């Protein structure tokens, strides 16, 4: 893996989004394993140990995949080819912004200011583009975020509803609009803080769930976002091969840990086309 030269966000939106992720994930992790879990299961019991280990397994995958996403260089910086050697029939084209030839399925990112190999999109939460080399880690990062927020939401239901006393209509307002405390009076209790984390996990579950459906459909259909928007489907090789194109030849193991090596079935400049019957 080639390391990116610059890993810090380039725009304010990227900076604040990435800062939010780097802040909220450790807070939720602490809340679930050191506040919620001991309140539901007795410390040292078998359910407590199993849930504690599972929570750390999820956290390891979230942090590991996030790290690989931001450090992995998936740009065309090392793929310079002389104009005479490139073939437009293979998908090579001239990028006016980079003033060089761009490989097939690569697109220029105005934020990263370079062409990205098999560019899917620019992710504001990681401050970089998702492309050929880090697509696998993005998919797994998204999957484990959804698992984590769903897992948190289910346990938070038991924790919040057993802990808080509800009074209509203020309790209803606090649940639906937790920031309304700044209008109706600041509530500095720990219950209000826990309630905000409960809302964050619920919103996170819905948000990552929608993203999982969208991006998993792209992977299964052999598409990236730009191609899907333009109705380009010539890279659809069947669901299994499409999955290998993103997760690698050992695709069935990539969900376990981000450190598992899984070689991609082709290089970064040549992609198989689906045979189209005339």
Predicted regions and their residues:
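Membrane-associated feature with strongest affinity for ZDHHC
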Residues: 1-278
């Amino acid at each position: 893996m080639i390391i990116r030269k610059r890993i810090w966000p380039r725009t304010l939106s990227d900076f604040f989004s990435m800062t939010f992720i780097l802040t909220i994930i450790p807070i939720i992790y602490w809340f679930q394993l050191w506040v919620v879990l001991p309140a539901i299961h007795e410390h040292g019991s078998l359910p407590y140990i199993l849930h504690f280990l599972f929570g750390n397994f999820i956290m390891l995958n979230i942090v590991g995949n996030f790290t690989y996403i931001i450090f992995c260089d998936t740009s065309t910086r090392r793929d310079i080819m002389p104009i005479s050697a490139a073939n437009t029939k293979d998908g090579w084209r001239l990028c006016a912004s980079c003033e060089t030839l761009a490989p097939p399925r690569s697109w220029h990112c105005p934020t990263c200011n370079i062409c990205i190999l098999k560019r899917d999109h620019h992710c504001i939460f990681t401050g970089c583009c998702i492309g050929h080399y880090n697509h696998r880690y993005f998919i797994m990062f998204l999957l484990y975020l959804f698992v984590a927020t769903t897992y948190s939401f289910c346990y938070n239901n038991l924790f919040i509803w057993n802990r808080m006393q509800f009074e209509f209509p203020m309790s209803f307002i606090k649940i639906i609009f937790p920031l309304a405390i700044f209008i109706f009076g600041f509530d500095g209790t720990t219950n209000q803080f826990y309630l905000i984390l409960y809302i964050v996990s619920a919103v996170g579950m819905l948000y990552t769930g929608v993203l999982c459906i969208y991006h998993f459909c792209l992977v299964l259909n052999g598409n990236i976002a730009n191609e899907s928007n333009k109705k380009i489907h010539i890279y659809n090789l069947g669901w299994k091969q499409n999955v290998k194109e993103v997760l690698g030849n050992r695709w069935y193991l990539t969900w376990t840990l981000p450190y598992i090596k899984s070689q991609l079935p082709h290089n970064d400049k040549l992609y198989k086309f689906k045979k189209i019957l005339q």
